[in-house]
């Protein structure tokens, strides 16, 4: 049996889930049922959810899953009159002759239930009562399902912008269902553009008022904090985390370390779900900024295209608001005066230190972090040195503080010790690196379990947590687990890392466009590099579109690969415009390989 403080949280979470499920099941119209199996499943689920909302019943340790099922079955028997009334109220005109006979047989079956006795040892043999569930309803378990034929009702913005638990749960359910439709063409019908804009606007107003480093104090004895790493647009990992750990509540705070958008198919969905929770529980949901939440990274990740695929001509406006919202995200948190969390890591001091011959490589402090003007960042966030370091820095095994070959800094265990000691902290939990980043760093943890203990020093530890399971980069899937950290009192400095895998997820098909003359990718590349094939006298360069063989009028738009392993980097002696065009070709080849892999 789990510890009392955990069981209480789990109980509260299950009660809320059961109440919400019962409300949803009660709203289902029987006229939408395709056959008697679905109708029977509806009645069973409704009774299970009603029974599950009974706190006295659930908290009894004798009520195992088997006993709960027995009790539910007995309850169905005792309420057979009510069940029969529901069955007899079914509208037969929607059924064919065979289905009418099936409903008739079901009525007879329910009438005979009063003579049955259900005991724990016999429940496993009740095949007629435990057929596969085929409900057209989302119960919030994050496991997905086949929702391809469902007509989803749009969600509307609540009056006075007061988000409730039911509203946020409904949003998560709708977005989860929409991911199984293999297309985002109807996304705006489910989540209207005005609702998405309202989410971003309301959350931005809350985030703007928060400090660069959010202090999480006042945690009670029965509270805990969940720290989540990179999600990279993988909505189903987020749903899995909520399903396993429970929702945000007064006794359970969530800290998200950034990188909400990425190469996953559902970047906008992940970001909007988190903004909804932030609006509902601003003090118990902390959203930090990641390296993906910058204008430059968003462009490289085709975030604008993702939004325009969903909202068409209204996409650029929402994209602009998301970019502005990114600037409002805090940069770090301190939990119970003991644990520092951030996306990338440590940063250099911007002050002048006369005692140091090389002040640019002095370690920065929490006091300096608080002084960063994060909300006034320019078009290129890379120009803000401290911000760049917070988002991009990485630990390594050598001592000292050094400039990285890419972005940010590299810092050793001695810097971790200095930062913890000077800040009076015991632990650092950062993110930013997954199995792809650690693939060529044999001296560091490989992140295949979703986390790594990188430094252990006298004052404490440095950990990395990554929450996108089965992470893919280019043509490689790392088959890694995702993870999150659970911190509990009294000092929150002994995290328990929970690893998981989400394998059964929908795959979004690449966008099909009707105009084969599209040169969007080529134009974006020319704008980015300042060079193009035209400068070499080539008027018909290779495009990023492929006519489909079964219908030449339908064009497949390839996505730029997240990382290219073959052919790059190019030798330094290759001159422009040849260098940019070679780069373009290698990326195109990688995109084609990626497309082939997803279709085999």
From Swiss-Prot:
GO cellular component, one term: plastid
Chain positions recorded as Mn(2+) binding sites: 230, 232, 343, 432
Gene3D superfamilies: 3.60.21.10
Domain of life: Eukaryota
Annotated GO biological process: plastid translation
Entry's family note: Belongs to the PPP phosphatase family. PP-7 subfamily.
Name this protein carries in UniProt: Serine/threonine-protein phosphatase 7 inactive homolog
Native source organism of the sequence: Arabidopsis thaliana (Mouse-ear cress)
